[in-house]
Amino acid sequence: MQKLIILLLVAAVLMSAQAVLQEKRPKEKIKFLSKRKTDAEKQQKRLCPDYTEPCSHAHECCSWNCYNGHCTG
């Protein structure tokens, strides 16, 4: 009987430890997922080069403006 009680206590401790660990995981997963770029953002990066690249129209620079042939912030 004592062995059963000890076994149940150990199981309860392990389950509570697992619950605490699982509560922390979603936050880490959210951080990881928020850093990932969507396919649309990746495509936009390919179409719109670095802001130091030359441009002739504002839309070529994505969210930047085109001034004197270069993207400005």
Swiss-Prot record:
GO terms for molecular function: ion channel inhibitor activity; toxin activity. InterPro entries: Conotoxin. The modification 4-hydroxyproline is found at residues 49, 54. It comes from the Eukaryota. The modification 6'-bromotryptophan is found at residue 64. The modification 4-carboxyglutamate is found at residues 53, 60. Residues 20-44 form a propeptide. Disulfide bonds join 48-62, 55-66, 61-71. GO terms for cellular component: extracellular region. It holds the Pfam family Conotoxin. Keywords: Bromination, Cleavage on pair of basic residues, Disulfide bond, Gamma-carboxyglutamic acid, Hydroxylation, Knottin, Neurotoxin, Secreted, Signal, Toxin. It is found in: Secreted. Residues 1-19 form the signal peptide. Belongs to the conotoxin O2 superfamily. This is Conotoxin Gla(3)-TxVI. It comes from Conus textile.
